[in-house]
């Protein structure tokens, strides 16, 4: 900074010294005022920067125009209206109608499949019924074959030789003629109750 020289007034030496003191005080006051003004300007600029940062933290006016913004809330949007609510209701109703139609189509397809499969189910049931009847008949026949044909109560135990019939229980076999004929010699012999063949021998068969 260039030095500025001010002419001193012509007078006594004491007056000159007093003038210099007053001049220096004025210079110091001016420098203090300049420093204070500079500090105030710096503080104002910092406050403005902080306010700008706070404003940037909140959505701008452009966010209202773009629903994709994180801050967008269509219910609080100033552009929201009853027409928008009606439009949403219409969209929901259309979605419901589409869903209902889809359900109805699936229901009809299921009914058709049930109608097609019903005859097959009936055939399977009929076949199962026939098989059951066959098994039942076999069990009945087997039960009859395992029951003594004389008393119709006890289980068969005696196997006749030579015809090989298993048709008598042991008590009924004892009640028959106890004589066993010798082949071609004795005419007084036991005969098979079923085929009337002479019995040459009897074997006790124990069934499980």
From Swiss-Prot:
Regions annotated as coiled coil: 83-147
Q: Does the keyword Coiled coil apply?
A: yes
GO terms for molecular function, please? zinc ion binding
Which residues belong to zinc fingers classed as RING-type? 148-196
The highest taxon in the source lineage is: Viruses
In which residue ranges is the amino acid composition biased (Acidic residues)?
22-71
Has keyword Metal-binding?
yes
Note the InterPro entries from the entry: Znf_RING, Znf_RING/FYVE/PHD
Biased composition regions of type Basic and acidic residues, renumbered to the chain: 72-82
Name the segments for region: Disordered: 1-87
Q: What is this protein called?
A: Putative RING finger protein 413R
